[in-house]
């Protein structure tokens, strides 16, 4: 089962909405089962509060999301890159859902050194991003912040990922064929 995590406030007319519709159509055409978490439509609360640390269950209100992640074979993230990073709502989702004990863990080994456990190993992900500027600007400014999700967070939890970047989306009304081909390849 695939789990789509969509993080854009406009799920009808935005470039990200076009990507979402395309991904849904491809998964349906290929007979794939999928669920969608639309963070803005669900009014996901991205804020960690002190109470989350004060009770043994911690992040009880995100257990359903954790169950969805646990059940999924593949995660498909669709979001714009704003100021070279993911939207705040998605960062909050990652921080509240991909928690210690669920997505990763640390213990002390026999040698007294920390041992890192990737608890979501075996899962895959596709990260699809839109950018308002061209690839040249992205490369010039650096890619590290925009790639935090796949290169750091997902890998840290044991999830292997593929990435599709759609540059210079401003003024483009439809999903270009070259981007559709890249998405198809990532979903294959």
Predicted feature residues:
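Short helix-loop-beta junction
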Residues: 23-31, 98, 151-160
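N-terminal beta1-alpha1 ligand-phosphate binding loop
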Residues: 1-32, 40
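Glycine-rich phosphate/pyrophosphate-binding loop and the adjoining helix
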Residues: 136-188
